Amino acid sequence: MDTRGCAWLLLLLSLPQGQSHQPLHRSKRRWVLTTLELQEEDPGPFPKLVGELFNNMSNNVSLIYLIRGPGVDEFPEIGLFSIEDHQSGKIYVHRPVDREVTPSFMVHFDAVDRSTGKVVDESLIFNIRIRDVNDHAPQFPEKEFNISVKESQAAGQPIFQLLTVDLDQENTPNSQVLYFLVSQTPLLRESGFRIDLISGEVRLSGCLHYETAPLFTLIVRASDCGEPSLTSTATIHVSVEDSNNHMPTFMEDRYEIRISEGQVEQGVLYLPVQDGDSPFTPAWRTQFNIWDGNEEGHFDIVTDPETNQGLLSIIKPLDYESQVAHSLVVVVENQEQLFVCTEGQLQPLRKAMASTMVSVQVLDTNDPPAFHPQSFIVSEEDGAWPAIQLGYFNATDPDRADSQIRYKLVHDPENWVTVDEKSGVVTTKKQIDRESPHVNDSFYTIIVHAVDNGLPPLTGTGTLMLFLSDVNDNAPTLRPHSRHLEVCESAGSQPLLIEAEDADLDPYADPFTFDLDNAQGDVEETWMLRTKQGEGHSAELTMLRSVPPGDYLVPLFIADRQGLAQKQTVHVRICSCRSGSECEEPSDTWLLWWALSPVGAALMVLSAALLCLLRCSCTFGPKRLRGFIPSDSGHQTLIVYNEESKVPSAQGCDTFFEPRGVKTLLSSTPVYLDRMVPRQQPLQLLEGRVVEAWSQKLQSIDVLEGDTGYLPHVYREEGECEGAETLSSLTFLEQDLSPKLLGCSGSKSTPSEAMCFTSRVPS
């Protein structure tokens, strides 16, 4: 094709003239250029003339024509265009051009004075267009497509759309694409496909049948409208998804089962079904329902996910006396709606169900007694006395009217009531207290069993909820932390918080009234009690004057809203504080609490046991002499003075601990002495030390009963002291001396004892 165009482009340019008295005339300049147009992929030969350019100023000035821009000295395609003769302005192309890469070139043309090299006219910008040829076929994004279509797909609806790309110039026949269905495998009369010529949409014609053809293969062609026409093909694999076109059916029209009354059982009957659709798909899975006969809710049916069968269960016990037989209508349907295709046309989707009959025969068994009602509420006042009839239980045997029923009390944690075995009458036997820990929200629960005389005996359960209305039977009391208070001597005027509590309910509880008990006459002079504002259960105790450190008892009365009061005592300890906030020494109250605590009690019991063992040790052995033991005789020590007299016989006294107390020294309590000096073991040493420690503590307590601040007092006056008499003046008979006198006098008196009594020994 000739690359020269048939149109000429005329560009008129004007130059201003110099000033003169003559009218101004505009000089015209013109570019004369043939239309520059190239054919895509021109085979040549090259270089090939594209066109010529001419400027009318060349009539007066020798010109040189220059070109520049894309295709000449700029990207893309550098060196594609050139001017062979600068004077004639002929333009050449040197190689083929791909329009899809560069559809046009913007080239600049200049006219230059050959002698001066100056540009004599404005540049001409010209668009060199590349004329398209049909050199690209339509292209599919993929060679093969895999799609799936439901078996219930309606005919005429698009199931897929093909899209192609043609790189030729848009809006020309070279890029216009048409679509054709080349083949379909398998080719069925009732199931087919078609493709839209322009849009490429694939549509279904007729109805699909999964069981007949689960897979189709379509070959399609895309062709452009160029000359010559170019084409490409693609393959579509259509998978058919099974839908519900087979209704489930029961294997039997009727089923019969026998069930004992009073039972709850899972899976008493399996109902198998048949379905021609693909297993484990929504078209195959079943849903069972009891259409009729289950008005009381005794039965339930579910689907076994593995076998697709129905499982009938008893979820509520059957009663033979109420109904001996049940007839159930069970229906089954698929999870997916059923579709039907008639003469190539899909019918509207609908629900389709199959049904069967299930006959249930109830077998009679021994039923437990039934309470009427099973649970009831009885109201009674708090503090009700014994012998009050609260109510009665009524139970019957559903099996026989003449059945003998016995009532048995099984839950009465406070042992408040009795239940008559025959009549079921509930009577109080103890006074009732609403403050019992077994009373929850004013309700006390009593549970009774009714036992029949069947084989085997069965039991029914009835409940009596005893509601106890509160009465004002509890006066307010101090809370445990308010009974013992401590305050530093320096902070004596600081109020002490006192809180009270009441076991009764409103209106027999707070707000409380706090008053001091001034029976002794001096309480109000020392203390002031004021109810705390905004709180009905607390008050503030304030010391009005300074008192010495010590323990003080503050009596007071606390009354509830109804005026029921009770005397209480607050133990206040005033102490010296080192840091200003804590007492230096613990209160004696804590010693009392320690003594009463389990640990203190255990230690006291252990000490008593050790004392008992010591007592037994002192009283066991040969004859004992009563007498006073001097304090300088030593503790468990044998005294030896290197005597040269007769060797004494083995004798000794029981070891003991000397109490260090005034009361002990002045008492005449006898001491039992042993003649043997046992070798003490470690346990005995421990016992002795414990006994000594406790004895000293007890004796010190006895001595300190009085006020230690007083000087010693004379408790007995025996007259003036007389002079001592000589031994010869002492008159007493030998017979008056006890033979046991020297039994514990030590080794120093033993020889003398032998000499004194020698005359009495028979020769």
From Swiss-Prot:
Post-translation changes: N-glycosylated.
One GO term describing the cellular component: microtubule cytoskeleton
Signal peptide location: 1-20
Stated name of the protein: Cadherin-like protein 26
Domain of life: Eukaryota
Role according to the record: Cadherins are calcium-dependent cell adhesion proteins. They preferentially interact with themselves in a homophilic manner in connecting cells; cadherins may thus contribute to the sorting of heterogeneous cell types. Ligand for integrins alpha-E/beta-7, ITGAE:ITGAB7, alpha-4/beta-7, ITGA4:ITGAB7 and alpha-4/beta-1, ITGA4:ITGAB1 through which modulates CD4(+) T cells activation.
GO MF annotations, alphabetized: alpha-catenin binding; beta-catenin binding; calcium ion binding; delta-catenin binding; integrin binding
Record localization: Cell membrane
Ranges in the topological domain labelled Cytoplasmic: 612-763
Glycan-bearing residues: 56, 60, 146, 394, 440
All copies of domain Cadherin, residue ranges: 21-140, 141-250, 251-371, 370-478
Primary site of residence: membrane
Subunit (UniProt): Homodimer. Component of a cadherin:catenin adhesion complex composed of at least of CDH26, beta-catenin/CTNNB1, alpha-catenin/CTNNA1 and p120 catenin/CTNND1.
Membrane topology, from the record: Single-pass type I membrane protein
Cell inner membrane recorded as keyword: no
